[in-house]
Structures are given as C-alpha cells and as structure tokens.
Amino acid sequence: MKLTVKTLKGSHFEIRVLPSDTIMAVKKNIEDSQGKDNYPCGQQLLIHNGKVLKDETSLVENKVTEEGFLVVMLSKSKSGGSAGQASVQTSSVSQPVSATTSSTKPAAPSTTQSSPVPASPIPAQEQPAAQTDTYGQAASTLVSGSSLEQMVQQIMEMGGGSWDKETVTRALRAAYNNPERAVDYLYSGIPQTAEVAVPVPEAQIAGSGAAPVAPASGGPNSSPLDLFPQETVAAAGSGDLGTLEFLRNNDQFQQLRTMVHSNPQILQPMLQELGKQNPQLLRLIQENQAEFLQLVNEPYEGSDGEGDMFDQPEQEMPHAINVTPAEQEAIQRLEAMGFDRALVIEAFLACDRNEELAANYLLENSGDFED
C-alpha cells in the first residue's frame, strides 16, 4: 500500500509498504527513498496519532492505514526502539522571533578572522556542534505570527487530540518556536532549563586571537557587530532599569527595528548576539518582554525615506564583520548564485561560515526571501 509521510517543515512524500512491515523496516524504507543524509534510520522518530511508534511493532498493530499518515522527525541522538520516546534535543537554538522565551545559551568563541566586509550585523551561531547540527539550527522552521498559529494547529493534529493548544504553545515557547524541538518536548517533557534565563558570561565572548579590525567609517560602535554597547545600559542607570524606554533614542535599536520590520527572521540571531556582547541588556529585555515587543513593533519614523535596509546594506549598515580571504571568496560564490549580498552574509554567518550549508539554506528558503 502507499503510505504518506509528513515532515515538520510542511512537506510530504509517499512510500510503498506492507501492513505487516515493522516500524524499523519503514524507517529503513524512508532512509532508502529519501537518502541516508536526510533521514538516517537510527535517528528517525515515526509518529502516528500523537504516539511515537516502537521499532519492533508493525504498521497493522499501530492501526496505520493507507488513508492515514505518519509524521517523521529526527532526534539528535539515536532513538531507542523499545523506549518509544523522543530524545530531547540539546543543541542550542537562537532567540525566537517572538522573543517570548528567556533562554540564552553560551556560545563558543569564533575563529581568527581577517579582512572586514561591510554588512548587516547578522551574528554567527557560534556553537561547538557538528556542521549538520549547525545547519539544522539555521534551516529549522522558526515561525511567528500567522505561521506560528498554523504550526500550533499542525502539531495539535499530529498529537491526535493528546495535546491542547496551551500545551503546544508552551512547548513551542520553550523550544524557541522550533516545531521539531517542541514535538520532542511534548513527548519527553519540557526541561526546566528551557524556561530559565541563563546569562552568557562576558568571558565567553572574547575571540581567540582575532586581529582587531576597525569598523567602517560612520559606525556608532567601536566593535564590529556590537549593536548595543555596554554604555547603552549604563546610560539608563540614572533612570528606571525596569523599563526599556531609553531604547527609543538609541541609534542601534532603531537600526534593529528597521531591519526587523523588513525581515522579522533576523530578530533571533540579533538577540543571540546581544546575549554574547551585552548580557546585562539582554537580561533587561527578558524581564520586560512585552515592552520590548511593543517597541520593536512600533512604526518607525521616516520609514518611507529610509527604505529597506537590506536594499542598500553598505550604505545603511556601516558595520563590519571579519572574514578570511577564503570566506570572502565563499561569500562571492554565494552571491553569484543570484542572492542578495545581505541575505548571503546572513545565511553564511547563521550556518557558522559553512559555504555548503549556507547554499542549502538559501535555496531552501528562497521563497521566504522573495516574500
């Protein structure tokens, strides 16, 4: 019989199976048809009516029919067939677009860089994880707004009535709006650490032997990518530290607002970078999330005259990032594929400066960029 298999990214494919096939055999079938690199058998979790299927059971035992469907997702570590539970993914994910959670995880220092490249300040997700994990973080479906509501409904349907809307929303919040991780949490429980703020020590933000490079002229900061200098919080010291009103007149914050209005997806890497450079300000934002979202969503003055900051990145964003000559060539090759330079740099940094992963990310999300 033909069996439909859905993914958490909204796509689906069909495989041919027998009702007597075991779940392990179905996983092997998916691996063979979709590729070992995409769906390795040992990392697959198959879900039917809100239940993770055990490897030794059969399709007929789990009442899987041709009219129904399975949901496939990947666990970071190999899933135990007899356990029947999803393993909680522990890889770090950047701050959510909705900014509704308050977890910031430490990031490893970047490698030595050299020549500057003017660009929009999209930080790298500098994680001590494998490249495949890095791409998973960069390309994972981080959703917001109407897309978030749609994802909530999809996950509720996936659970077959096992989860209510409040539970799914809480799981998504704890998972930084990453649906794959949220489903993991729904099956295995939401770790308490996922809902606790973890300030990033300043000692962890220093680069390892990186040569200092001055930012492009006109930049309001002396450090590349430093959107909110420590003085930003210090300047508010005489006022009420429980409010973010002082950000209204902050040039860096106005730049962030302009960019977020034109491309909401960049907010979460911005917040991650902020956590590395200025944990005190990030903590303040976490304590006043509603006010922060209100400030970000307010219409900015002169928007008609300023235009989209992604249209003229070199003029609008006088910051600099540090790249090696080899990385500069990689960026140019990605640009040659027809993508905007600012988007190329955003993807390149988000994929931990891996050209192949950045290319895949740009291709997979090209429709979103056009919107």
From Swiss-Prot:
Superkingdom as given in the UniProt entry: Eukaryota
Phenotype of null mutants: Slow growth with abnormal phyllotaxy, shorter primary root with fewer lateral roots, shorter inflorescences, smaller siliques and reduced seed set, with unfertilized ovules interspersed among seeds of normal appearance. Mutant displays resistance to mitomycin C (MMC). Increased UV sensitivity in both roots and hypocotyls, specifically in dark conditions.
Low complexity bias (residue ranges): 79-117
Tagged with keyword Cytoplasm: yes
UniProt KW DNA repair keyword: yes
Any one Gene Ontology BP term: nucleotide-excision repair
Domain Ubiquitin-like: 1-79
Region (Disordered): 79-142
Domain (STI1) ranges: 242-285
Example GO molecular function: polyubiquitin modification-dependent protein binding
UniProt keywords, alphabetically: Cytoplasm, DNA damage, DNA repair, Nucleus, Repeat
Compartment annotation: Nucleus; Cytoplasm
Classification via PROSITE patterns: UBA (PS50030), UBIQUITIN_2 (PS50053)
Tissue-wise expression: Widely expressed in the whole plant.
Record-level GO cellular component terms: cytoplasm; nucleus
Limits of the UBA domain: 146-189, 325-365
Biased composition (Polar residues): 128-142
Principal place of residence: nucleus
Subunit structure: Interacts with 'Lys-48'-linked polyubiquitin chains. Interacts with RPN10 via its ubiquitin-like domain. Interacts with UBQ1, UBQ2, UBQ5, UBQ7, UBQ10, UBQ11 and IAA16. Binds to RAD4.
NCBIfam families in alphabetical order: rad23 (TIGR00601)
Family listed: Belongs to the RAD23 family.
Biological role stated in the UniProt entry: May be involved in nucleotide excision repair. Binds and presumably selects ubiquitin-conjugates for destruction. Prefers multiubiquitin chains rather than single ubiquitins, with a binding affinity for 'Lys-48'-linked ubiquitin chains. Acts as a ubiquitin receptor that associates with the 26S proteasomal docking subunit RPN10 for the indirect recognition of ubiquitinated substrates of ubiquitin/26S proteasome-mediated proteolysis (UPP). Involved in UV tolerance in both roots and hypocotyls, specifically in dark conditions.
PANTHER family: UV EXCISION REPAIR PROTEIN RAD23
Protein name per the record: Ubiquitin receptor RAD23b
Organism, as annotated: Arabidopsis thaliana
Gene: RAD23B
